[in-house]
Amino acid sequence: MITLMGCGSKEGELETNTKVTESEVKETTQNNTKENDMSEVTFDYTTLDDGTLSIWSYNAENVPEVFEIPEEIDGQTVSEIRGSLFASEDKIKEVIILETVTSIGKETFQLATSIEKIEIRGNVEELGDYAFFACKGIKELRFNEGLKYIGKSAISNNDNLTDLYLPSTVEDVSGTTNFGSQSDILRIHVPAGSAAESLVTDAVKDADCNIEVIAE
């Protein structure tokens, strides 16, 4: 049982009204638009054998704080991100990966320092080696059903990562170096009774850090 405690205003407590001017609202809207503006971002990519695109770099004079991977470029579907796309990133705070992406390649987010949130909306099937290695700002990672392969040290050395959600579809966790070297406890959530539960439990049994596998 988990007991939750919250804080709120007491009954009868006076509310404070804050007057917001029209200019303040306009300025806030403009700032939010600038932070999320992808209009000036261009990408370097490769066309794969199936005709879909693999993005490996981006170009932008003004880097948006919220960065969205497009579903398509010039009518071609984006299925992969790779090649240190966000490696050592120090400006972007949030990355949104849309539904078409099925592969996050080698070293894609390695050593990113500014990224605090990664939202994966689709069914990513594989994580390349060191894909999320030493991403210092990430506290939570969630993968949807469909993830099958987790490469060597793909999720490792993330000092602030406390919760990792893996689906029942995980079939291969490459090596025991995954999930290691967290500074505090890492809770790995997996579906109870799934093959993923056994795989992950086996992968972390000799880990040199505090990892808890939670079957739910």
Where are these regions (language model features)?
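Short beta-strand/loop segment at the start of cytosolic alpha/beta domains
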Residues: 31-59
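Alpha-helix boundary recognition
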Residues: 87, 110, 133, 156, ...
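Structural signature of tandem-repeat unit edges
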Residues: 42-51, 62-79, 90-103, 113-126, ...
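C-terminal motif of bacterial Sec signal peptides marking the signal peptidase cleavage site
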Residues: 3-6
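Consensus positions within tandem repeat domains that build extended binding/scaffold surfaces
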Residues: 83-85, 105-108, 128-131, 151-154, ...
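N-terminal, intrinsically disordered, polar/charged segments of Gram-positive cell-envelope systems
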Residues: 11-40
